[in-house]
Amino acid sequence: GLAVAMTFVMTSLENIQAGFNSFFIVRYLLEKANSTENALLLLMKLPIASNCNILIADKNGEMVVVECTPYEKRIRKAVSMDNGKIVCTVNSFTSDEMKQHDAAKGNDYHSAKRYDTVMESFSTHIKGNLIEATEQLLKGDYGFMCQYDEPDFETVWSSVFDLKNLMIYRAEGDPRKKKFVVDSRLHDVVQRK
């Protein structure tokens, strides 16, 4: 019942340090932690190699994004809305305190637009069947998300995690063109125990 995900944030070459990159952070936290609180304690002790956002959520609804640089970490808590709470991350830092560390300077494949689409959609469109509504969000039905038509940049996968039921819904590639399929491996492993 723990999800950990990452997004890259551009780092100036001179700021890269010895430490964990975002892929290893995700792997480490998934192997060592069992809750958002536990993952946060571990993450705050790790040396960070380069800029990234780490999204952490657990089956109890505790969720945060940690904006990380080699020199500083900042925790962004979930935003409460009428229909629940949400946390979102894109390929930039969204807190005012951390924006100065983002070397992309806005050249980040429309990160701000994607962030705004998620946050606005949660209050207006994400109701009823949350899995289906989130899939529609990722397909771009509510605004710009993953609709890249550039030959050198495309969506690798889009995933929706149901942490209470341990189910993953994944589109491998552009979710406008690829169907979301159910990945029940985690659910099945837990059921066998």
Question: Which residue stretches match the model-derived regions?
Answer:
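C-terminal, well-structured catalytic/ligand-binding subdomain of enzymes
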Residues: 2-193
